[in-house]
Design a protein with these regions (language model features):
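Polyanion-binding surface elements
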Residues: 1-19
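Short beta-strand micro-motifs in enzyme catalytic cores
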Residues: 2, 37-39, 156, 445
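Residue-level detection of the helix-turn-helix DNA-binding "recognition helix"
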Residues: 21, 25-26
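Short helix-start
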Residues: 28-55
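Short, charged recognition helix plus adjacent turn
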Residues: 55-62
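Phosphate-binding site recognition
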Residues: 62-488
Length: 488
């Protein structure tokens, strides 16, 4: 009988060497034997559990293929599919959103929950830039619907992201927004036959520049939809990622009123008074209160975390995580993975996992760490709690003791109230993923810390306060936190 190594077999079966060794150690590969530290496997042996694996793959479409199993931080759908990287199939979201019939939709989810990747996926599916790119979707859920084949690559799509917009002044932030808008214009300019436009339309097109004023910038996307509708005969789709980033920058740096005025005008022109708009989808972390920027948008469908719409489209379900862990030989860790990274609730789904932490955990081959909690600056959360009242600090103590809080709050976040109302702080902590809803009755929410990863993050923050020389921690009971604090 001929034999081959577990590494060779792993390549043949398109799984990791760790997975093959796991099967060998559990007696799931007939005829396999260990010599020293190396497993030897019969050449002709069948892969164990193939039928069950395929059943799960069809049901949950968790794919870990190619030489590189996990792509950490890649938010480009085309790149993931082209390079056969780790991808949990979320393409049914395309069908769900399209069949909702909503003209303008806002979806809020915590950071690192696949918002950008899902918008990239929508762009690849609908955009004329990806015409005849069925290869990106073959074998995925959406491609099982033959009626959707004719929609692929059919529409002009304006894909704009505010994710990287940073600045300490209104002018600096506006300039970065302008750069993003210019890039979208240039992308279309490279494929449009400008001779088909009137002289006035070409002049309007040319007015878009990095130094355009706020009024021109606020009308720029509306202008582009008009031009694209005339050119293609299909009303464009607008995809706007991280819509709330400029507003957060405005809050941090004290130009809130100017930014609210601009974003309100931008939204009104682009999404309300725009007869050339086909569909629009916006994503963000927070749901800014309606009085700030959404007062004129009566037609927007807001899908917040408690909404039952698109419950599994962002983040990983428990089954998706289980299958993913099994494919890389880490299934034995599933209970601890649940303790660390589970706990996010969207609608009625209470078993949603943080995808960033899961992919980092797999990439690190089973090392537990606060991956998600370390991906952004927690300065705002830390500052607000540090400056908060004694009651707020006591509430944090209760949460860290594993208790639940009964609070009244609004999922719409009013930044103007953050330093004055504790309910606004709870709204922020919930929107950003640090708290989860255990129960909801009208405006009363039963809240608790999301998971162990979040608990460790908060204990680290508070421990740093104790090491500081000021009195910001004065209302905390030092002993309780230092005794239970988890080492960084």
């Amino acid at each position: 009988m001929q034999y081959m190594t577990s590494r060779q077999k792993a390549t043949e079966w398109s799984v990791t060497k760790r997975m093959v060794n796991y099967w060998c150690a559990n007696g799931q590969i007939e005829g396999a034997y260990k010599e020293g530290s190396r497993w030897w496997i019969p050449v002709d042996v069948e892969r164990p559990g193939e039928e069950e694996c395929l059943r799960r793959m069809r049901a949950y479409t968790v794919r870990i293929t190619g030489k590189k199993s996990v792509a950490v931080g890649i938010q480009d759908f085309e790149a993931l599919r082209r390079d056969q990287m780790f991808y949990v199939d979320k393409t049914d979201f395309i069908r769900q959103w399209w069949e909702s019939g909503e003209t303008t939709t806002l979806i809020t989810r915590p950071r690192r929950f696949g918002k950008t990747l899902n918008l990239s996926m929508l762009n690849c599916f609908f955009s004329v830039f990806y015409e005849n790119r069925a290869d990106l979707f073959e074998g995925l859920k959406v491609w099982e619907e033959k009626s959707y084949h004719k929609l692929q690559g059919r529409f002009p799509v304006i894909f704009l992201s505010f994710a990287g917009v940073k600045g300490t002044t209104f002018e600096a932030v506006l300039r970065q927004i302008n750069y993003g808008i210019i890039e979208v214009y240039r992308r279309f300019e490279r494929i449009l036959d400008m001779s088909r436009f009137t002289e006035r339309e070409r002049q309007d097109f040319g007015r878009i520049s990095w130094d355009m004023d706020a009024s021109t910038a606020a009308q720029s996307v509306r202008l582009l939809t008009d031009l694209l509708y005339v050119y293609y005969g299909h009303k464009p789709i607008i995809l706007l990622d991280e819509y709330d980033t400029p507003l957060q920058e405005a809050y941090f740096n004290s130009f809130w009123d100017e930014m609210v005025s601009f974003v309100g005008a931008f939204f009104n022109n682009s999404f309300k008074t725009n007869p050339s708009l086909g569909r629009a989808l916006l994503t963000g972390i927070t749901r800014i209160c309606k009085e700030s920027i959404f007062s004129d948008l009566n037609n927007i469908d807001v899908v917040a975390q408690t909404s039952t719409k698109y419950e599994t489209a962002f983040g990983f379900t428990e089954e998706e995580v289980k299958v993913g862990l099994a494919r890389v030989g880490l299934l034995d860790y599933r209970e601890k993975v649940k303790e660390w990274y589970d706990g996010f609730t969207f609608g009625q789904r209470r078993d949603m996992y943080n995808p960033w932490s899961i992919t980092k955990f797999i990439d690190a081959e089973g090392i537990f760490d606060t991956y998600w909690a370390n991906t952004s600056n927690n300065k705002l959360v830390s500052s607000l709690i540090r400056k908060s009242s004694k009651n707020m600090k006591m509430a944090m103590e209760q949460l860290l003791e594993g208790e639940m809080l009964h609070v009244e709050m609004d999922e719409q976040l009013d930044f103007a109230q953050l330093e004055y109302r504790e309910s606004a702080i709870f709204s922020l902590l919930y929107a950003t993923g640090y708290l989860r809803v255990n129960q909801k009755n009208d405006q009363e929410y039963v809240l608790m810390l999301t998971n162990k990863e979040v608990e460790i993050m908060f204990r680290r923050i508070i421990r740093e306060w104790f090491n500081d020389m000021d009195t910001g921690y004065g209302d905390f009971r030092k002993g309780r936190f230092l005794q239970k604090s988890v080492a960084a």
